[in-house]
Amino acid sequence: MEKNKPISVAFEDIRNNPDFIEHSEYRFINDDLGMVISFQAMGFRLFRTQQPYRAKEGRIVRIMQGKGRISINLIEYEATAHDIIIIPDNSLIEISEVSPYYEFQVIMPTANFLPVLQNSILSEAYTRNGIRLSCNNEEWAHISSFFSLLWNILHCLPYRRGAVQHLIVSLLYNLKYIHEHTCKSTPARLSRQEELFRRFIALVNQHSKHERNVNFYADKLCLTPHYLSSVIRETSGQTVMQWINQAVILEAKVLLKHSNLLVFQISDELNFPNPSFFSKFFKRMTGMTPAEYQKQT
């Protein structure tokens, strides 16, 4: 029997999803981008709670109502109405919980549609962990206008590619302004320890598939292993190894659910010495074997 295939959030998989194709009045998708104006109205669950996903393309998410908790590259955010979430390319995403009638809109440009993004619009914070913006009423009204105008232009014939491209760039410049203004007006800045923690998490997201030694991360940050361990525990309440193991488990879950790799291939992909070692590690961390996890719907 063919196993239940989970929903992937890569652009091409979403584009070919039959539920997504069916609800054309609430979504737009072409070779350049996808946009959804109401996930509630589309009537299907693209995302499941407690299920990690690998998002190949970046997203601009506009929270319309309700509240939820989302982890982006191991950093957890609470996302409520009037929030904007900017998710970087190739992110690990996990939604831990959402309230009833949670509603959001999404703009999802393909990687080549806005090549200027990484270098000149968004900050380093975006490329590492994403950004959550809590907007005031005026900022929210401006962003609403961008979303509405983009939605209308997307449905003009012929397709106005340049207008769409520059409108999204303008939206991102506006979001950058809001982000920078918020940082300047908020007295509380990240402490050195918190900044080290963010840098450590970025390294874990980048290297945990192959590097699980405290010394490696300490060397990358020009710190002693003892000092790094102390800072991470003091800042986050978890040890260096707990964060590394958490990243490995998230990656393993994504591969188990969203790839055709067999368990022994996933073991190799994640640099375990053998499949038995990987299976024991996975069960110790999750309470179930990799095969049992794959069978979950």
Segments from the language model and where they lie:
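Short hydrophobic/aromatic patch on the recognition helix
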Residues: H82, L228, F277-F278, F282
